Amino acid sequence: EVFGMDGSCRSDFDHRSVAHEVLKRVRLGRRIAKVHTGRMQVLFTHRGIMPLLMALQSALNGKTALEGASPLAGRIGQQVLDPRVCICDDPTVDWALGSCPIDGEGVQSRRTPLIEAGIVKGFYYDLQTAGRAGTSTTGNGFRRTGAGDYFEGQPTPALTNAMVAPGSESLDDMITSMDEGIIVDQVMGAGQGNILTGDFSVNVHLGFKVEKGKIVGRIKDTLVAGNAIETLNDVAAIGNRAERDF
């Protein structure tokens, strides 16, 4: 199963490009390639990297840090990731699905730097969590939005549009530079992990084998495991194209 998606508050976004990308991945997956167990280069697409970003999302939650359950608690100002990694939350992006003028507590929305040049700049907070931590809210207080529970419970820290700054390498150049490795494009669910340590373990739903800089086929029955913080501190390159995921 291969899927693609995009989203915007505008009605005129380019849906044809989504279909084109899906068809391209279908063609690449016609051959099956074998992959051996072991450590190797891994190229995560914007879809495949979600388990790592979810671990970071938990680690950067002010409530998680306040409770001492975050591996980044007490590490503001410290280098924890590769210097090329920059992450922010920005609810002011035009037409993005998570954009909003205020959060669920009436606080004006604003861009919040979380990781800059691999350094922890801060956490995201709601009013209550910020008060307990002795700091100011970042305008990230939201209630749950599941079916039937829009106004149940208190607001809690939540991200709006989490964004990873693009790097300098094209996807083709990154693939060409790989001697042997895999591309993780889609994963099955969020996998399993431990937010206390940043560990993750996830089954690859759609992935490809790379040999001598070329995609040689689709991989099956493959699991990728590691630690999100260690992985993002051992980066070979970051793609230069910003993509949206949900």
Task: Report residues per predicted region.
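N-terminal small-residue-enriched
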Residues: 1-246
